[in-house]
Amino acid sequence: MATPAVPVSAPPATPAPVPAAAPVSAPASVPAPTPAPAAAPVPAAAPASSSDPAAAAATTAAPGQTPASAQAPAQTPAPALPGPALPGPFPGGRVVRLHPVILASIVDSYERRNEGAARVIGTLLGTVDKHSVEVTNCFSVPHNESEDEVAVDMEFAKNMYELHKKVSPNELILGWYATGHDITEHSVLIHEYYSREAPNPIHLTVDTSLQNGRMSIKAYVSTLMGVPGRTMGVMFTPLTVKYAYYDTERIGVDLIMKTCFSPNRVIGLSSDLQQVGGASARIQDALSTVLQYAEDVLSGKVSADNTVGRFLMSLVNQVPKIVPDDFETMLNSNINDLLMVTYLANLTQSQIALNEKLVNL
């Protein structure tokens, strides 16, 4: 079961700079449409196809910035069509549940980036629940970025998603990620592409440069802003980020956290007995904390909390009631079974070694 940690505080809404209108080449069989402002997202009902030349490698120019309140250009802009709202949490809860494997994959992609690349981007995969969006997987997407333009290999992104669907058919495209501490004008153009693949996509930023001394992780969703009939802008609204773990992921995270106290940042794998001992020590510390809290409540040092009391009562009721003699009998039986398995394994190993020597004679 995934156990969320303390939510990361969401920063205030960040208006993104909106680049100028970006022409995108259309397929040969379809006449080129009138250029529209880059801030107007494309409807989700028109995803990019493999036969579309623009989907192979999209190169979009972004020469300057246009404020969201700027006057309309000379030509009549295309009407802004907001994408459909992401089903589930975003009308209310606005919660993104992030698994640690996502962060590890993003950091690994950043460390392996091409020489001269300022940041890396990629696609976020996961599932949509009733009250939250759970990001469980991701993959990086090659792109080239300069001051004037950004080019994204959309065909590579589509092929990678098709491969992921064969392994995890329930995972959907939820949005995209980028390394860095801020949202650039090119982020609006990339976000427009992902609006075709997912309704109201998520934009996740991971500060791999550790600008504030820590790896800041933020999630946003885009919102159109402006006067109807004028050039529309985009505002990125922050979302609440929580961390979720599977049991296997939690073991890896606990092991990685131990490297914080190692001078060389390296730690070896512990044996099964050491893991059992560590788990027992953690349980003992937790029980000591619970007992101290109960004593403080009884002595009047701490006011009683009904929520904590109900939780402790539920925890106590889950403990099975076993007679000490029966428990000792079950423990001895399990120990005897373990000793028998160990004896048979050693006997089999000896027989195999003896057989090899007889064959070599």
From Swiss-Prot:
The modification Phosphoserine is found at residues 50, 262. Its EC number is 3.4.19.12. It catalyses: Thiol-dependent hydrolysis of ester, thioester, amide, peptide and isopeptide bonds formed by the C-terminal Gly of ubiquitin (a 76-residue protein attached to proteins as an intracellular targeting signal). The MPN domain mediates deubiquitinating activity. GO terms for molecular function: cysteine-type deubiquitinase activity; metallopeptidase activity; translation initiation factor activity; translation initiation factor binding. It is found in: Cytoplasm. Phosphorylation is enhanced upon serum stimulation. Phosphorylated during apoptosis by caspase-processed CDK11. Component of the eukaryotic translation initiation factor 3 (eIF-3) complex, which is composed of 13 subunits: EIF3A, EIF3B, EIF3C, EIF3D, EIF3E, EIF3F, EIF3G, EIF3H, EIF3I, EIF3J, EIF3K, EIF3L and EIF3M. The eIF-3 complex appears to include 3 stable modules: module A is composed of EIF3A, EIF3B, EIF3G and EIF3I; module B is composed of EIF3F, EIF3H, and EIF3M; and module C is composed of EIF3C, EIF3D, EIF3E, EIF3K and EIF3L. EIF3C of module C binds EIF3B of module A and EIF3H of module B, thereby linking the three modules. EIF3J is a labile subunit that binds to the eIF-3 complex via EIF3B. Residues 9-20, 30-40 have a biased composition (Pro residues). Component of the eukaryotic translation initiation factor 3 (eIF-3) complex, which is required for several steps in the initiation of protein synthesis. The eIF-3 complex associates with the 40S ribosome and facilitates the recruitment of eIF-1, eIF-1A, eIF-2:GTP:methionyl-tRNAi and eIF-5 to form the 43S pre-initiation complex (43S PIC). The eIF-3 complex stimulates mRNA recruitment to the 43S PIC and scanning of the mRNA for AUG recognition. Deubiquitinates activated NOTCH1, promoting its nuclear import, thereby acting as a positive regulator of Notch signaling. Residues 41-78 have a biased composition (Low complexity). The keyword Nucleotide-binding does not apply. GO terms for cellular component: eukaryotic 43S preinitiation complex; eukaryotic 48S preinitiation complex; eukaryotic translation initiation factor 3 complex; eukaryotic translation initiation factor 3 complex, eIF3m. The keyword Amino-acid biosynthesis does not apply. One of its GO terms (biological process) is translational initiation. It is an enzyme of class 3 (hydrolase). The modification N6-acetyllysine is found at residue 242. Keywords: Acetylation, Cytoplasm, Hydrolase, Initiation factor, Phosphoprotein, Protease, Protein biosynthesis, Thiol protease, Ubl conjugation pathway. This is Eukaryotic translation initiation factor 3 subunit F. HAMAP family: eIF3f. Belongs to the eIF-3 subunit F family. It comes from Pan troglodytes (Chimpanzee). Pfam families: JAB, MitMem_reg.
